[in-house]
Amino acid sequence: QITRHTWLYTEMINAGAVIYGDPDRFLLKNDGENPVALQLGGSEPQDLAKAAAKAAAYGYDEINLNCGCPSPRVQKGAFGACLMKEADLVADCLNAMQEAAPGCAVTVKHRIGLDRETDYQPLADFVGTLAEKTDCTTFIVHARNAWLEGLSPKENRDVPPLRYDYVYRLKREFPALEIIINGGIKTNDEIAAHLQHVDGVMVGRECYHNPMLMRDWDRLFYGDDRAPVSYAELAGRLKDYAAAQLAAGRGTILRHMARHYLGLMHGLNGARHWRRMLSDAELLKPNDPDLILRAWEQVERANDFSDGLPVNKE
């Protein structure tokens, strides 16, 4: 763990996959990852209830309904962002999920609007309907519209303009709700600025590409002054985690894990060697988790970690 207190959200998983697929494939997690929220996609209350019940049995702390994904595939399934047109149906879904998983918080993630709509009121109506008809009190708001036509999912994360002011206004008008802002947030200073207006901040791609951004979050945002994880500790934990996953015999190979580690040494001398070694097909083929430590040695030699923080030797 880089941060002990920050919530981790899974990728969106179709409720049908959870119900009819291999539950371990979609729901199994490491106990050290908590608090963790499972994000579900779907629009059938009964299916979402079944998926929520399974998630609760796997120890998830929260179950989040995605009402923000704009991809054509998701639209064909009549869920994701297009659900913002169906607040009553979303309410039925949330209520069914909560009844099936009473020990979990049930939340919703959505956009500020659809297509090129610029009026604030439909957003307020959507949130107001859910606040009135369900026990949901946490709303994670991506501060962009979802364009249902004309943009790819990737473009939908960048092209529609950000309207942070709409999310701030939601918090002012619904002070009893927990409003969490998402979209285009990349630095700790930006996080701190948003927290002057809303209850929480969700950071997505920046954490994936630069995970050590999270290293100081416990101190900065949770008041936990314990020493953050060192780079050396993290490399050792990654090696142990990879070894455990390989030993579990579920078909996982080192390449499947290592590709998600590439950003961990972002900004350090030797980061290029780290990325190269952990993406080299020949080096990965033996499935030897010690490769992680060998890659770490390249970074360690190129930086001074004597006081716990890296100082480039160049």
Question: What positions do the PLM features span?
Answer:
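Glycine-rich, positively charged N-terminal anion/phosphate-binding segment
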Residues: 1-61
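Non-cysteine beta-strand/loop elements that form the S-adenosyl-L-methionine
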Residues: 10, 61-71, 133-146, 203-207
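Active-site beta-loop-alpha junctions enriched in small/polar residues
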Residues: 13-15, 41-43, 68-70, 111-115, ...
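Glycine/Thr-rich phosphate-binding loops of Rossmann-like dinucleotide-binding domains
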Residues: 18, 73, 116, 149, ...
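Active-site beta->alpha loop and helix N-cap motifs at the rims of alpha/beta catalytic domains
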Residues: 35-107, 111-119
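Glycine- and other small-residue-rich loops at beta-strand/loop junctions that grip anionic moieties
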Residues: 40, 82, 86, 109, ...
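Glycine-rich tight-turn/loop motif centered on a GG-T
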Residues: 72-89, 120-121, 150-163, 223-225
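Alpha/beta catalytic cores of nucleotide-metabolism and tRNA/nucleoside-modifying enzymes
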Residues: 92-95, 99-101, 105, 114-116, ...
